[in-house]
Amino acid sequence: VNCTTYKELKNVSYEKEAFDILNRIRGNIQEETSIFLLIQLSYLALNYKPLSSKEELIESVASDFNDEYTLNQLKRVIKKVPFEIIEQVSDNYDENTLKAIILFSEDNDIRSNLSGTPLGVTKLVNELLEVQSDDTVLDLGSGIGSYLLETKMETGAEKVCGVEINIQMNIISTIRAKVAQFPIQLKLGNILSQDYRSFKATKVFSNPPVGVREPGIDDTIKDNNALTELIDIEEYNISADWAFILSSYANQKPGGKTAVLMYNQVLFREQDHDIREKIISEGWLEAIIALPEKLFPSTAIPFTLLIFSENNETVRMVDASEISTRDQKKNILTNKNIQEIVAAYKQENEISKHLTYEDFEKQEFILTPIRYFGFIPDASKMTPIDDLTRSINRGAMISRKELDTMTTTKETGIKYLKIQDIENASINKNLPNLKNVDEKYHNYFLEEGNLVISKSSPYKIARVENSKNTKILATGNLYYIEIDEDKVNPTFIEMYLKSDEGQAQLERLSTGSVIETISIKNLKTILIPNLSREEQDTLVKEYLEYEEQLDLLDRQKEIISQRRKELIEKVL
């Protein structure tokens, strides 16, 4: 297959034929029919066309592949599937149809968990990476080879390589590369635990699995020299998602460029804060490109494309979340869409901008575009927060000198709340004690269920809870809000104000050049979505369940830390 033929094969209609082939084998074999079996059977039928016996087919397959996994798997299919079915498929379908099934079937909604990188995404990645014919391109987590084949065909890159841990996917990639007759180097391996700098890749791409739970992630990555030389894994709490991302960048040749597709949670998840700060402070992150939802057939969630290179003084941010073309039930990126995104990447416009370390620091290194482009709410579907509250007040203005006279180490049942005491979106349980509080400050005591929000950016928000036996005095750098519970669930408002949309509204209504603050007047104009009480309560119930789980984990951590300390003491 040359490049021209490869492009022509993309236009071959094969969905009906693929369905017919799968129907032929249903009931004839015990295992579940799948795209994995479909591609193998189509390859065997294609290979059998000039042959006349099973023995000749086995010999032909053996001459095509030198890796034991692919060879043994194809021999297994020849043994498992009634040979007359292979003969029938070979006789009934022409070469181009069989080749199209082998090369492109995942792009045409044949239901399977083996899916590849969509064509439009591949083209966008290669435009942004600026892949040239003399590049060595490495795909870490290469799956079924979609990105590799398209990249070889579209760019003519000198060397195209892939690493994949899943044997089935690697076999599909191997078969596809053979049918396309593209010289692609494929390797079975683990991109988290192994060093692949030997490929000397000038361009690296990765579309890794998302949301992977890897309990022993530190043990998995400790022998990956590429990663451990890039970052101190003992200093940073690296999640599996960021291990995939950083492993990709770590395998890039100096002077090269890396692109990683990842779901949006990595942009704001609290546990990844330090890693996000690190990649920006070190100048590793070149660009953040928010992509539209429904680009992948297997999920509707939106993804973000992270571009890495060296010595970046600013980060390019592109909000391309609305740039796509509808194609039946999914979205695709057409050539026009791609050029629009690339143009925004190269030059600032209404959907792109260059951001500094200080810009990200103000947002606590949350990287979602809505934080930086603002959010214009639809007022027709929202209600001003002032209409949902009984009061919005500022905390007590107490001088440092006066506060020193009021502070005590004794437990008095009266506490003092400062901005610093709001951690991880909740109020610190060990607040400082106060004594002899003047009656003029009694109006500033917080009540159970009040929302507390910092007066200045970055905006911290917390809910007052479990305070019935304690009085808490709010500082003047905080606002406290009494919600009208007859109109809205207070925790729903808390959730919304903590969201990207809520934070974007707060930022948009802030004033000040050095320190951004929001006035009570502007705070009252914040718009809250008009959800039914039932919808609010459902969301709040789930939210509070997650909070309980986090509290439990914190308590378990404290217990384990104490037991470890006691064990250490036994050594002495």
What annotation goes with each model-predicted range?
Residues Y6, P208-S399, I414:
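A conserved structural/catalytic subdomain of Rossmann-like adenosyl-cofactor enzymes
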